[in-house]
Each structure stands twice: as structure tokens, then as C-alpha cells.
């Protein structure tokens, strides 16, 4: 069974990951962003989804909670350049995985 890393978001977000060699990328905004994200979230072959932080404001709290506690696929929200990051990687790892990587 092959797993994948998917990047979904605005053009600026996706372009950076394409330059790093990630080929499974989807440019989407607004309602299309939510639709494309949910399709990938339900894909059993998808291991990691990197998505624009704007998605958090577009989905209901119940769905957001299930996304935040999911480990397969692991969802990583990234801010757009110029926007404040809400949660550090260390905090997210501790919340999702129960591991404090800040003291490593």
C-alpha cells in the first residue's frame, strides 16, 4: 500500500512545496479548498495533508476537531506568508502525538 503527501492551498503555498519536489499538490481557494481537502482527507492512501490555515475558518467545529485529532492522515495547517501562526509545531506535536519535542 503506497502512501502520499498532499499539499492543498493557495498558489503561493502550493508553489513552494512543488519546488521542494512534492508532486501531489492542489491549488484551491474558498469553497473549492474545503471540497478538495475533504476528498483527500477521506482518501485511505493519503498519509499527510499540508493545508492552508485558512481552512480552519471555513469548516465547522466538529469537523475541525476530528481533523485535529486525526493521525491518518496527519493534517498540518500552515500559515500564508504575512499571517500570524496560531500554533507552533512543538505545541501541535504535544497535542496530537503526546510528545514534547521542545525538550529534545
Curated annotation (Swiss-Prot):
GO CC, alphabetical: plasma membrane
Lineage: superkingdom: Archaea
Pfam family, one: ATP-synt_F
InterPro entries: ATPase_V1-cplx_f_g_su, ATPase_V1-cplx_fsu_bac/arc, ATPase_V1_fsu_sf
GO biological process per UniProt: proton motive force-driven plasma membrane ATP synthesis
Membrane topology, record value: Peripheral membrane protein
Alphabetical UniProt keywords: ATP synthesis, Cell membrane, Hydrogen ion transport, Ion transport, Membrane, Transport
Cell compartment(s), UniProt: Cell membrane
GO molecular function: ATP binding; proton-transporting ATP synthase activity, rotational mechanism; proton-transporting ATPase activity, rotational mechanism
Function summary: Component of the A-type ATP synthase that produces ATP from ADP in the presence of a proton gradient across the membrane.
Oligomeric and partner information: Has multiple subunits with at least A(3), B(3), C, D, E, F, H, I and proteolipid K(x).
Sequence similarity: Belongs to the V-ATPase F subunit family.
Name this protein carries in UniProt: A-type ATP synthase subunit F
Source species taxonomy: Archaea, Methanobacteriati, Thermoplasmatota, Thermoplasmata, Thermoplasmatales
Amino acid at each position: 500500500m503506497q502512501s502520499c503527501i498532499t499539499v492543498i492551498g493557495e498558489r503561493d503555498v502550493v508553489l513552494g512545496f512543488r519546488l521542494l519536489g512534492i508532486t501531489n499538490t492542489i491549488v484551491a481557494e474558498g469553497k473549492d479548498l474545503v471540497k478538495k481537502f475533504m476528498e483527500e482527507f477521506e482518501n485511505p492512501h493519503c498519509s499527510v495533508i499540508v493545508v492552508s490555515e485558512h481552512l480552519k475558518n471555513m469548516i465547522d467545529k466538529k469537523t475541525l476537531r476530528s481533523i485535529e485529532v486525526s493521525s491518518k492522515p496527519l493534517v498540518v495547517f500552515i500559515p500564508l506568508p504575512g499571517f500570524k501562526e496560531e500554533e507552533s509545531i512543538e505545541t501541535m506535536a504535544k497535542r496530537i502525538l503526546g510528545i514534547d519535542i521542545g525538550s529534545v
